[in-house]
Amino acid sequence: MNKKVKIIGAGLAGCEAAYFLANNNIQVELYEVKTLIKNEVQKTNNFAELVCFNTFRSQSLLNAAGILKAEMRRLNSLVIKIADGCKIDGDDALAVDREDFSKKLTEVIKNHPNITIIEQNVSHIDDENDLTLIATGPLTTNELKEDIQRLIGKQKLFFIDASASIITKDSIDFNKVYYSGRHKLGKYICCPLNEQEFNEFADNLINAEQVQLKEFEKSIFFKGCQPIEQLAKTSKKLLLKGPMSPNNLLDQNNHQPYSVVQLRQDDAKDSLYNMVGFQTNLKWPEQKRVFQTIPGLEKAKIVRYGVMHKNYYINSPKILNFKLQVMRKKNVFFAGQITGVEGYIESASSGIWAAINILAFINNKKIKPLPNTTILGALTNYITNSKIYSLKPMKCNLAILEQENKYQSNDKFYSFNNSKNSLEEYIKQLNQILGTSI
């Protein structure tokens, strides 16, 4: 078989897949359209742009996000390697300078001798002749969406996603805010609100003017990324239990406020901060008006406003096998958020897994599914499980893991150790089958 792979989309999944295949002597043509067609959320021409957040979530090996990153490191993830090198203070999270991250990752991909970058709007998938990985993410172009529909049928789905505002540090009134962190591993800027201030702010959110959605879009928010105003409209208590929770955010007098708005460092220069959990669909003038009612942010300068966008994904259980391969078209694979995984690390890791299977396909080798004792294996099993009637976007979590003896174990790191051991054994077998050196 011709050892060349066409990858559509230079996002997190596409770049991970390209890097893995290229490192295994596969020629990769990586197609990217963002220099030709702009969209409402991406701001630069660099690959793998981080739109919603600047964090790859917790590094704790007691939770799924931390375990998945450990699995990715073991699989030689480019995304995690670059993220580790661009790390900024983020409490227990792996937070990065988002521009530095995308820039450095782009440099690695563009300078790889086995990767050719092609700036082109791909509108047709040659599913008969090309070995293709579709990793176009949530912002797939209309032309390609139509051709994907031709390929897989009318089984594509979507949800509404949103991003948060970013403000300049020098516009914050530090007489009214303080530094604190829930996990004592890092510091966030905390804007405290008393009960009256909180209620007034919540009312402002509820009554603020939003960008109008179409009728069929109004009830399909992804629950992990709901706009702050949507939470407020559902119940003010959701704000106190979620993004405005004051728990363990004590001020300099060891006092816990009624509620808190957290600001997280967004760049290596420590000049920009994003509003944690404040994804929004408010009109831009309304964002400025409402957010400037928060104590300490009265003169806040917003350098990037929150926006909302539609995320497309396919009905993977009906379309893909465990290899992330289209069941009816064996030379077409999918990876990333378009498969129904949700989140940066979930998308990136699916790119690695798709690339492993593409390498096996090229070499006519058969490999087994990843063990469901690993986060990546369990997540892949979830999105490709034919028993799922209606796929909803899924972040990694411990509930989907296969861990029969967890509750008989006294090891609080049971899930991590189980994942580590089973992945190590799997990689050993994989290297023997594929001749790789992972």
From Swiss-Prot:
Keyword terms, alphabetized: Cytoplasm, FAD, Flavoprotein, Methyltransferase, NAD, NADP, Transferase, tRNA processing
Residues annotated as binding FAD: G9, A10, G11, L12, A13, G14
A GO term for molecular function: tRNA (uracil(54)-C5)-methyltransferase activity, 5,10-methylenetetrahydrofolate-dependent
GO-annotated biological processes: tRNA methylation; tRNA wobble uridine modification
Keyword match Nucleus: no
Pfam families assigned: GIDA
Main location as per UniProt: cytoplasm
InterPro entries from the UniProt entry: FAD/NAD-bd_sf, MnmG-rel, MnmG_N, TrmFO
Example of a GO cellular component annotation carried by this entry: cytosol
Catalysed conversion reaction: uridine(54) in tRNA + (6R)-5,10-methylene-5,6,7,8-tetrahydrofolate + NADH + H(+) = 5-methyluridine(54) in tRNA + (6S)-5,6,7,8-tetrahydrofolate + NAD(+); uridine(54) in tRNA + (6R)-5,10-methylene-5,6,7,8-tetrahydrofolate + NADPH + H(+) = 5-methyluridine(54) in tRNA + (6S)-5,6,7,8-tetrahydrofolate + NADP(+)
Origin superkingdom: Bacteria
Family named by the database record: Belongs to the MnmG family. TrmFO subfamily.
PANTHER family assigned: GLUCOSE INHIBITED DIVISION PROTEIN A, METHYLENETETRAHYDROFOLATE--TRNA-(URACIL-5-)-METHYLTRANSFERASE TRMFO
HAMAP family attached to this UniProt entry: TrmFO
Name of the molecule in the record: Methylenetetrahydrofolate--tRNA-(uracil-5-)-methyltransferase TrmFO 2
